[in-house]
Curated annotation (Swiss-Prot):
Organism superkingdom: Bacteria
Compartment annotation: Cytoplasm
Cofactor(s) listed in the protein's UniProt record: Mg(2+)
The species this protein was found in: Acetivibrio thermocellus (strain ATCC 27405 / DSM 1237 / JCM 9322 / NBRC 103400 / NCIMB 10682 / NRRL B-4536 / VPI 7372)
Any one annotated GO CC term: cytoplasm
Coiled coil (residue ranges): none
Functional summary from the UniProt entry: Reversibly transfers an adenylyl group from ATP to 4'-phosphopantetheine, yielding dephospho-CoA (dPCoA) and pyrophosphate.
Gene Ontology MF: a single term: ATP binding
Pathway involvement of the protein, from the record: Cofactor biosynthesis; coenzyme A biosynthesis; CoA from (R)-pantothenate: step 4/5
Site residues by UniProt (Transition state stabilizer): 17
Family membership noted in the UniProt record: Belongs to the bacterial CoaD family.
Primary gene name: coaD
Protein name: Phosphopantetheine adenylyltransferase
Keyword annotations of the record: ATP-binding, Coenzyme A biosynthesis, Cytoplasm, Magnesium, Nucleotide-binding, Nucleotidyltransferase, Transferase
One of the Pfam families matching this protein, by short name: CTP_transf_like
Length: 159
């Protein structure tokens, strides 16, 4: 069984992430979307909220599972018996950072492969931080995030 892992903060999940999830899910038997507990980041949405938002967003994609993890991605990959990391790229600037991470992971485990997927051009401008900024100022996030989570995101910033 082929198991791919798509790691990220997903703070919150966007339609750019969903584009990668939907396309990557077609390439493997199981896609694990791994929500990172990152001590160097200060997420707006709690870990539980990010997992819940993703679970709502991936309903109907049968071979996708949502899990959280902390620590090294390589250790999580071993637990999942996975050899493939999925990374979405919007621009060359994403590639520079992700290439460094891919080389580091390859150095830690030579069997690990990183599969880079270009985001659909319609989402090349989109980031979780831009969604948060729009929501923070009561801007329109229609079409930027899955419909099933739009109100939850806006509610987070109305508090």
């Amino acid at each position: 069984m082929s198991v791919f892992v798509y790691p990220g903060s997903f703070d919150p999940v966007t339609n750019g992430h969903m584009d990668i999830i939907q396309r990557a899910a077609k390439l493997c038997d199981k896609l694990v979307v791994a929500v990172l507990v990152n001590s160097s980041k200060n997420p707006v949405f709690t870990l539980e909220e990010r997992v819940d938002l993703l679970k709502c967003a991936v309903k109907g994609i049968d071979n996708v599972e949502i899990e959280s993890f902390s620590g090294l991605l390589i250790d999580f990959m071993r637990k999942k018996n996975s050899k493939v990391i999925i990374k979405g790229l919007r621009a060359v600037s994403d590639f520079e950072y992700e290439l460094q991470m891919a080389l580091l992971n390859k150095n830690l485990d030579s069997d690990i492969e990183t599969l880079f997927m270009m985001t659909n051009i319609n989402y090349s401008f989109l980031s979780s931080s831009s969604v948060r900024e729009l929501a923070r100022h009561n801007g329109n996030i229609d079409g930027l995030v899955p419909d099933c989570i739009k109100d939850k995101i806006m509610d987070k910033f109305r508090r």
